[in-house]
Amino acid sequence: MDINEIREYLPHRYPFLLVDRVTELDVEAKRVRAYKNVTINEPFFNGHFPQHPIMPGVLIIEAMAQAAGLLGFKMMGVKPSDGTLYYFVGSDKLRFRQPVRPGDQLVLEADFLSNKRGIWKFDCRATVDGRPVCSAEIICAEQEI
């Protein structure tokens, strides 16, 4: 899935679209693998931190949630243009393991865990060069708009 198709399934736009490409999306296996190329040109590096730039943890979480959202949209067979959005509403078991720096490729993986009455749960991981960066269970709420 290239950036044009990603933009069909995610309502986010610059500077908040945090998925560059999907390399695997398997609806039957209920999993997605994607990545974000992190460059020094990201607007958040101006203030976080100019002399020692690292990607804010909340944006790593958001990137994982966006990957999970892509999986959710594909599993349901809908797009935001159909009148449905998935809102990030929480996380469980959140852990950060190492910082993400300019030049890193942030690999995002999400596996579907459950959907109960429109509350979706995904097991998400972010890695750089195969090393764990962040992991969490991401919780999203399905909402018609």
UniProtKB/Swiss-Prot annotation:
Keywords: Cytoplasm, Lipid A biosynthesis, Lipid biosynthesis, Lipid metabolism, Lyase. It catalyses: a (3R)-hydroxyacyl-[ACP] = a (2E)-enoyl-[ACP] + H2O. Its main location: cytoplasm. GO terms for cellular component: cytoplasm; membrane. GO terms for molecular function: (3R)-hydroxyacyl-[acyl-carrier-protein] dehydratase activity. It is an enzyme of class 4 (lyase). GO terms for biological process: fatty acid biosynthetic process; lipid A biosynthetic process. Its EC number is 4.2.1.59. It is found in: Cytoplasm. The active site is at residue 48. NCBIfam families: fabZ, PRK00006.1. Belongs to the thioester dehydratase family. FabZ subfamily. Involved in unsaturated fatty acids biosynthesis. Catalyzes the dehydration of short chain beta-hydroxyacyl-ACPs and long chain saturated and unsaturated beta-hydroxyacyl-ACPs. HAMAP family: FabZ. This is 3-hydroxyacyl-[acyl-carrier-protein] dehydratase FabZ. It comes from Stutzerimonas stutzeri (strain A1501).
